[in-house]
Regions:
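Domain-scale signature associated with acetyltransferase and cell-envelope carbohydrate enzymes
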Residues: 1-105, 125-129, 137, 147, ...
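Conserved catalytic-core motifs of eukaryotic protein kinase domains, centered on the activation segment
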Residues: 109, 114-115, 143, 177-178
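Glycine-rich NAD(P)-binding loop of Rossmann-like domains
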Residues: 116-128
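C-terminal/domain-terminus segments
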Residues: 144-166
Length: 189
């Protein structure tokens, strides 16, 4: 293994030390990080194997707001400055790439004018395997994004997205379907 890989693994191990002894955080093997990872809150955060949380500019923030909340990051996922906030559940599948986006399973306020001062209802967010989410994307509560999908920069996702498409815009809409042969990383493990 080249010395740079050894140094990156050592740095990843050292920078995740504050989380290695917390009961509510599970760090998968070979997690890469560079000190730009912040995990806070009383809920559970789980990383799969070979997750890369190596952000060059922005901090990766994983925040749980309730003890029963869960954030799961699948194997081989890459996080680059994303913010994930869970009151119930946010799942990111295997082989996903997340830019400086925001995923929330709840809003800090209710949509109803009558209940505006109360927190919104939590609805799970699920990102299936091999999804690429660009920068400045907002994924709102209750959304499921199908596998092998690309979400373009600055998109705001209100509704479920089918598998194998490229979406963009505000609100996000399907721009085109991806070729079935081009999708899927299909790493073996």
């Amino acid at each position: 293994m080249p010395w740079r890989h050894v140094a990156a693994r050592a740095l990843g191990w050292v920078t995740t030390l504050p989380y290695r002894w917390r009961d509510n955080v599970h760090l998968g093997p070979r997690l890469l990080g560079n000190g730009r990872l912040r995990i806070s809150g009383p809920g559970r955060v789980e990383f799969g194997a070979d997750v890369n949380a190596w952000s060059h500019a922005e901090v990766n923030r994983l925040i749980t707001t309730r003890p029963e909340a869960v954030i799961r990051i699948g194997r081989h996922a890459r996080l680059n400055g994303c913010t994930i906030v869970a009151a119930e559940r946010v799942e990111v599948g295997a082989d996903c790439v997340l830019g400086s986006c925001e995923l929330r399973d709840h809003l800090p306020y209710s949509e109803s004018p009558v209940d505006r001062r109360r927190p919104g209802r939590a609805q799970p967010v699920v990102i299936e395997d091999n999804v690429w989410i660009g920068g400045q994307v907002s994924i709102l509560p209750g959304v499921r994004i199908g596998h092998d999908t690309v979400v373009g920069i600055h998109a705001v996702v209100f509704d479920d997205i089918p598998p194998g498409v490229i979406v963009g815009g505000n609100p996000a809409r399907v721009l085109r379907r991806l070729d079935s042969g081009a999708s899927g990383d299909n790493r073996s493990e």
